[in-house]
Amino acid sequence: MRRMFGDCQVLSSMAAMAGASSSADALFASPLIPNPALAGFMSSSAAMPFHHFSNAAATLIPKEEGLMGGLHVAKDEEMDLEMDMELSGGSGSAHLDGLLSFADVDDDHKPQHSGHDQPPDAAQPSGAAGGNAKKKRYHRHTAHQIQQMEALFKECPHPDDKQRLKLSQELGLKPRQVKFWFQNRRTQMKAQQDRADNVILRAENENLKSDNFRLQAAIRNVVCPNCGHAAVLADMSYEEQQLRIENARLKDELDRLACIATRYGGGGGRQPVLSTSALSCISAPPPVLMPPLDLDMNVYSRHFAEQAPVMGCGDLIPPPVVPQHDGAAAYMGAMMAPVQEQDKQLVVDLAATAADQLARMCRAGEPLWVRQRGAEVMAVEEHARMFSWPVDGAKQGDGGAVARAEGTRDNAVVIMNSINLVDAFLDANKWMELFPSIVCKARTIQIINHGAASGHLGSGTLLLMQAEVQFLSPLVAAREVVFFRYCVHNADEGSWAIVDFPAEGFEEGLLQASVVRCRRRPSGCIIQDMPNGYSRVVWVEHMEMVGEEKPLQPVFRDYVASGAAFGATRWLSILQRQCERLASELARNIADLGVIRTPEARTNMMKLSQRMITTFCANISASGTQSWTALSDSTQDTIRVTTRKNTEPGQPSGVILTAVSTSWLPFTHQQVFELLADEQQRCQLEILSNGGSLHEVAHIANGSHPRNCISLLRINAASNSSQNVELLLQESSTHPDGGSLVVFATVDVDAIQVTMSGEDPSYIPLLPLGFAIFPATSPSPAAAPTISSSTTTTTGNGNGETSSTPPRNSSSNNNNADELLPPNGCLLTVGMQVLASAVPSAKLNLSSVTAINSHVCNAIHQITAALKGSAGGAGGEPASDQ
């Protein structure tokens, strides 16, 4: 009786533990974010999907609580299992099949258990429990059963009762066996994922410990460069530290003013009066520390009273409150200041020269500026005759290739005052947010002069900056440039000038070898305030390509050479759109539209959408950190594929596969934009809708055009239920001259609830897809493009020197209206992303690359077919904008 009672007690406890495990799976399950646009292309492929476990990890049987503890397999069965594993090919899923394939054949009076849910005494002889008890018999699931359950598990790790019942009937199993198999499979997957995360966290912890020890040792060995003694603060108070910092800052400011006074205020043979620190700078080599105004953009806090200038023995240890930047990186940046103290006055003189040239270029007309198809293009020879640069670089670039110049000018009215615009131009992070589709990277290397006496950046500010500008296609290389940015205020005219000029001789060691080398000639904008809070902006863009450029696809040769890809028109169109967007974000008289109830929820939704746009633009361009691969050797192939391993928040963790293609279409960019921005028309494209319809549940207007908006769409799919609703976040944006964007990403209901509640949405994972459309003339007026299964082929002249800027449909200057010919087509960039594997260390399967390539090609063909149908059978003839 005692033995039987003990057996019952063990069985009941195991049943309770199994129930707990099931509830834990329900609580802690983390399904991958679905992607409706690509939901069908992986499943339709004949290739096997990704396995999320490596061979080495799959052979380790995890120790599961409550489920694995009761599994006892006889020695002969273990040998059979090992032989089956060896014959299975060694894949991770095959090993898991071996672990999950045991099931018992019981009599009709006992419940069945599958795999790891067997009672602990199941393998004991029947005589130990009773004389007439039958001995349990175990068997493995068949290969077909395992394959079917694995297939369902990859689609739905948590099947409901109907799915389990249907599967059990198809496989000849009992529903309880299917239920237990799925429980064990989920438990093993969670254990493997936890183990991998634990290894990563341990490695990161060790790295942080080693960095901490190294920095502590470096602090203990710090030596003052002025006196050579150890720099120790001892028991110095916080107030004394601040006083020392302020005192050193004032000394340096006095030295700077003394240098300026000796240059411009003195005369004759009078000797300049210099302070002791200034004399030490002349007689001794420059110190290893950064000058006081030589601060990294990520370090300074817009108030220079908090920054550490020239430091003495007691000032080398930073104050207790450190700005948001890594201390070691700031210290290294201080030792590598490109512009030393003795060179600063030269840079200030160059800034004044560049500002004068910019003002003259903004006022000049012909022959400096000539109109070509509605755009103002610089006459390079006339510019060289009118303007000279004191530190002019050689006209011969790398390899003896002649530098090619691009110069354009445009003007526009934006809905933002000059103060806010100047503040955005002088802050690298705000500058990137203001131009998300063209500035992919930007940082301030050094602050030469802060300008304003109050400590804020303003008139007279002089910065050394580094930026990387992009075009939304991997077929056009990004351009990296190091330049000085100077801000000056003209009080008489009430205008501000933001002028950039080349950093000749100061960019050594700052440029990457993987991007196009450029020299930014005096360029920039003049901002004039208007009475109604608007600003009129005149923009001049002048870039010079140095060395031999990479060959471009025929579809881009004339477009890039004319300056349309990186010219003033594109910069101004993006500025107009972002100013409209920021103005709508600050508006508070917005009616309740959909599920967005509060202004805070509206602001959070716009921030989430802005991050989606920025992520999409960065992931489809040819920035210096991404390597793109062509799928064929044909020079006409326009599809490029890349992969990246992501572990940072904000995007799904794992291996992300991206495919991008750019094609020229014989339709206006507004026609293509209307097709792709309208969710109802887009649902007609089978490759993009996946058979489901969309219903708008929230709408945020953020521009003057009706299509400039953010939408939250409900995906009406057959898989939806009351507990599982798929949502789509979409933002569409258009400008008559600068082109259009349509970007969308799937989000779950929980993420939207977090956004609506006012919490930080920066950690919500987004994997955006979308389209970029730019107005462009045909690459070859004599030949129409043809679209093949994988690319758009064109015939161009190939000289790369003609100027065929896409004309402007609306301009403030209508004197040459007869030259404003409408564009006869557009450039369409299609960008697709898919989470290939949730494990960052997984290997990419070639079948997945083939599948996403086919998906992009089919999308282009369906878009072209839909546009031809809407044009009334006009074939490849472009439609008019009128």
UniProtKB/Swiss-Prot annotation:
Annotated Basic and acidic residues bias: 107-119
Region forming the signal peptide: none
Location(s), subcellular: Nucleus
Pfam families linked to this entry: Homeodomain, START
Function recorded in the entry: Probable transcription factor.
Compositionally biased spans, kind Basic residues: 133-143
Region (Disordered) location: 104-144, 782-820
Protein name: Homeobox-leucine zipper protein ROC3
GO MF, one annotated term: DNA-binding transcription factor activity, RNA polymerase II-specific
Domain START: 340-584
Positions of the DNA-binding region: 134-193
